[in-house]
Each structure stands twice: as structure tokens, then as C-alpha cells.
Amino acid sequence: MKAFLVALLISIELALVFAGCPTIISKNRWGGQQARKVEPTTKPLKYVIINHTSGPSCVDEIDCSRMLVYIQNRHMNHLNYNDIGCNFIIGGDGQIYEGAGWQAAASHTPGWNKKSLLIGFIGDYEINRPSLKQLEAGKQLIECAVERGEIEQDYKLVGARTIRQTNSPGKYLFRELQSWKGFTRDP
């Protein structure tokens, strides 16, 4: 009985600690495959990297799920990644979708995968502006990661273009990131 009460109290405390975390649509729900292999990371991570998919956006869960299945297939079958390349992906609908998740290193930039959390935004933000819903979801996800101990309190936030040759996350999203907590051009 005592062990049950202790477990119950711990569960309640964890629920309160993570109460600020947004809803994350599971990989299973959007139709994703399981990872071929999980490369673990050492927590807390120092970096949060933001990229974009540089393709069309999506407007609802059905549309975003279809795009994620396509992206995951491309990443796993053509780029030989273990999973979809991002830890989490934010759709044009403002919802957060599980990618590789909290426990696995993403597949995006050699030398950075095991020390960063990669958040992707579905869409092309070189030509389009991200929605306010997407931007808020990104900020909430980062706050959640801090609360969970997944990233350091004094994390560094970078656009993918800061660490490799790419236009990602697009000029409009990159411009927005510059006002976010932790943003740096010099990781």
C-alpha cells in the first residue's frame, strides 16, 4: 500500500511538472514506421536546431500525416536515415508531430545529431511565412523540453543554416527565430 501511494504521488508530481507540455501526435497515430535503429543522446542537450521541409505546407492532421509518411519514407529509403530526420515536426495546422522523439538522436547533420533536438516545420519558409500557430507550437515545445530536462536551461537555438550549407529554415522562419529565447548565430 505504501509503495502504491509513493508511486501515485510521483505520478501526480510528474503530471504537474509536465502539465505545460503541448499535445504531441504520436508517430503511430500519423502512420509512421518504427525506427530501424535508435541512436541515444546524452541529456540534457545543448542545442535546439530548427529546419523546414522546404516543400508544401499542410492544413490539417490528415494532410500533415500524409506528408509525414512521405517524408519518413524518403528519409529512410533514399537518404538511409534510421528514422524521419527530425525529433519533432510542426505542421501547418499548428500541431506537433512525433518524429524520432525524445529518446533518439535525429538524423540531420553529422557532428550535431547527438547533441541537439531538431524541430522541423512543414513548409517552405524561404517563400512563405510560418503561421502564428506554428510559431507558438515551436516555443511551447522548446519550453516543454526544458521542463522535461531534455535540453539545458541555457540551450542555444540555431537555424539549420547556421551549422551547414542550406537555406533551411528559410528566410522568414529564420527571421522569426532571431527573437526567440536562446537564439544565437555563433553556436
UniProtKB/Swiss-Prot annotation:
Domain N-acetylmuramoyl-L-alanine amidase: 43-170
Protein's name according to its UniProt entry: Peptidoglycan-recognition protein 3
Keywords: Disulfide bond, Glycoprotein, Immunity, Innate immunity, Secreted, Signal
Entry's transmembrane regions: none
Cleavable signal peptide: 1-19
Family stated for the protein in its record: Belongs to the N-acetylmuramoyl-L-alanine amidase 2 family.
Domain of life: Eukaryota
Glycosylation positions in this chain: N51
CDD domains the UniProt entry points to: PGRP
Localization annotation: Secreted
Organism: Holotrichia diomphalia (Korean black chafer)
Listed InterPro entries: Amidase/PGRP_sf (IPR036505), Amidase_domain (IPR002502), Peptidoglycan_recognition (IPR017331), PGRP (IPR015510), PGRP_domain_met/bac (IPR006619)
SUPFAM superfamilies: N-acetylmuramoyl-L-alanine amidase-like
Function comment: Peptidoglycan-recognition protein probably involved in innate immunity by binding to peptidoglycans (PGN) of bacteria and activating the prophenoloxidase (proPO) cascade immune response. Binds to 1,3-beta-D-glucan and PGN.
A GO cellular component annotation in the UniProt record: extracellular region
Molecular function (Gene Ontology), one example: N-acetylmuramoyl-L-alanine amidase activity
S-S bridge residues: C21-C144, C58-C64
Cross-referenced Pfam families: Amidase_2
GO annotation terms (biological process): innate immune response; peptidoglycan catabolic process
